Amino acid sequence: VHLTAEEKSAVTALWGKVNVDEVGGEALGRLLVVYPWTQRFFDSFGDLSTPDAVMNNPKVKAHGKKVLGAFSDGLTHLDNLKGTFAQLSELHCDKLHVDPENFRLLGNVLVCVLAHHFGKEFTPQVQAAYQKVVAGVATALAHKYH
């Protein structure tokens, strides 16, 4: 991902304030509610029958935390996202058969959740930087598919 020094600074400064547990669960939960077809990859998670069930599901929260942990790792390797996410790309492609479009959807949901949590602090400039990052991560995760 090609970010200016200002964009990198904005991304890392905001990320230092992110509660990964809370934001991860909320982002994955919102993905599953807003794009219900993504639920098919989470059959083992139990009750996903209503928005409340999804948002309060402990397995959704735990996996969201795990996803955001991987995203955090990516933020420390912005110059090598393909390498950073190579194993996850292989897992999601070869074993889980996840539609790579879902990575883009989750990135966009994450941006919405960050905007909700940070309000005025999530300026248009910060959003633009995060959009670049989530697009880069989605591309890296989809790399094995190409």
Swiss-Prot record:
Where does tissue-level expression of this protein occur? Red blood cells.
The family this protein is said to belong to = Belongs to the globin family.
Globin domain sequence ranges: 2-146
Biological source species: Cebus albifrons
Q: Which UniProt keywords apply?
A: Acetylation, Heme, Iron, Metal-binding, Oxygen transport, Phosphoprotein, S-nitrosylation, Transport
Question: Per its database record, what is this protein's job?
Answer: Involved in oxygen transport from the lung to the various peripheral tissues.
S-nitrosocysteine PTM positions: 93
Which residues are reported to carry the modification Phosphoserine?
A: 44
Q: Which GO terms describe its molecular function?
A: haptoglobin binding; heme binding; hemoglobin alpha binding; metal ion binding; organic acid binding; oxygen binding; oxygen carrier activity; peroxidase activity
Residue numbers binding heme b: 63, 92
Quaternary structure per UniProt? Answer: Heterotetramer of two alpha chains and two beta chains.
Residues modified to N6-acetyllysine: 59, 82, 144
What is the annotated signal peptide range for this record? none
Residues with the modification Phosphothreonine, per the entry, are 12
What this protein is called in its record is Hemoglobin subunit beta
Q: Extract the InterPro entries matched here.
A: Globin, Globin-like_sf, Globin/Proto, Hemoglobin_b, Hemoglobin_oxygen_transport
Q: Which CDD domains match?
A: Hb-beta-like
What the entry lists under PROSITE patterns is as follows: GLOBIN
Residues spanning the membrane: none
User: Which GO cellular component terms, listed alphabetically, does the Swiss-Prot or TrEMBL entry include?
Assistant: blood microparticle; haptoglobin-hemoglobin complex; hemoglobin complex
Annotated positions of the N-acetylvaline modification? 1
BP GO annotations: hydrogen peroxide catabolic process
One matching Pfam family is Globin
